[in-house]
Amino acid sequence: MYQPDFPTVPFRLGLYPVVDSVEWIERLLEAGVRTIQLRIKDKRDEEVEADVIAAIALGRRYDARLFINDYWRLAMKHNAYGVHLGQEDLETTDLKAIQAAGLRLGVSTHDDMEIDIALAAKPSYIALGHVFPTQTKQMPSAPQGLAQLVRHIERLADYPTVAIGGISLEHAPAVLATGVGSIAVVSAITQAADWRDATAQLLAIAGVGDE
């Protein structure tokens, strides 16, 4: 049963771009996206704080669900909608502080064991990946494919889920057909020949999520 220790999110978060700059946040919110993540890697908090502040302000302006990847202290300090953490971050993060601050929590998973770990944290949503081969980041695990994704979705039937990893415009309908609540995309938008057109098509397929 879906009873997270953190504030709930809609079962369907819709199209969920993951981007590395405030510029992309602004572009995509203007284009109609309503769930989005700022993922800046390998910088100190003081180096990214201005970007986090700007992204959160944009999220509020567009009434969007803006998640901050990794920088949970900054997300708490500036009252973001939510935080997204990888498995490697769970042990070093003060989850109770995030919960007390009223932020939503998303957690990445790559296999059954990591799903068990995520469920123990009782997050707002669980991300399942990587579905297809991806060039966006180095992955120690193998792509799961659609059959494995279906199995995980069946296990997490009443939990908000997000599929991520190598999801292209062409793959999107088949991924959503598994019953997953949302699709997270990176290069399908940021490396598209026409990002506006790609975003519009993906929004038509995945929607903006439930209210």
From Swiss-Prot:
Q: Which CDD domains match?
A: TMP_TenI (cd00564)
Manner of cofactor binding, per the entry note: Binds 1 Mg(2+) ion per subunit.
- Broadest EC class assigned to this enzyme: transferase
Give the binding site residues for Mg(2+): 70, 89
The record's section on SUPFAM superfamilies has: Thiamin phosphate synthase
Q: Where does 2-[(2R,5Z)-2-carboxy-4-methylthiazol-5(2H)-ylidene]ethyl phosphate bind?
A: 134-136, 166, 186-187
**What does the sequence similarity comment in the record state about its family?**
Belongs to the thiamine-phosphate synthase family.
Q: What is this protein called?
A: Thiamine-phosphate synthase
